[in-house]
Amino acid sequence: MSEGKIVQKTEVPATVESLQADLHALGVKPGMVVLVHSSLSALGWVCGGSVAVIAALQKALGSAGTLVMPAHSPDLTEPSGWESPPVPESWWPVIREHMLAYDPVLTPTRSMGIIAETFRKQRGVLRSAHPQVSFCACGPQASRITNNHALAFGMGEHSPLARIYDLHGFILLLGVDHGNNTSMHLAEHRATFPTKRVIQQGAPIATADSRRWATFEDVDIDSSDFDRIGKDFLRSDAGHVVRRGRVGLADCQLMPQRDVVDFTGGWLEENRSN
């Protein structure tokens, strides 16, 4: 959405203070661990843009809280699997040989939104080591969340998603829906269903003096039914844990990650049957 259209739909600009108040009303409290998926344009016009949104989140969480965001870089993946857009097969060996290695400081996010990309570059933010599905975190639990992110099965048991689960963290959908809810991928890794596939992935990683193309196993993830899962979760008995409200102009949801992951695992085993 263009900035002009955002201005047109906004009656009063959002500020750090107004966003913090909205977050508090939604249920964000000091000391929480919160994984945020976000859309800046959904919030309306914000004084200070993405920097102000992050400031509001950090103020709402306080010094004891930990803010987490996805920092994925899907362009550092096996090129034979690219679809949006695909590239010629003759390019694949060139990409594998020459794609720059993942660097937690330099590698930008892709398709995560400007709030997540801004957060990645801020002082004090830690980023996990996975070349494709890294996460960034800031706060007392940041090291625990981002350390020891395994290369294989990058959104499974040895991932930041699993550490957030261990910490009884929360998911905040800030103007986005469950199609963006990466915690459901943790459920994909844990659940057993007939269509589940393990694939060979690849990515460029740094070595002591250069880089190499590493290959590793991963679950062939699929988010196409995540919105349906989210709607079923809201309608279920488990859905009472979801807090819904407005932050700026955005429809938002705050929920315990464990409840979402556990429900999603059961849903996948029941519904992904063919």
Predicted regions and their residues:
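N-terminal and secondary-structure boundary signal
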Residues: 1-274
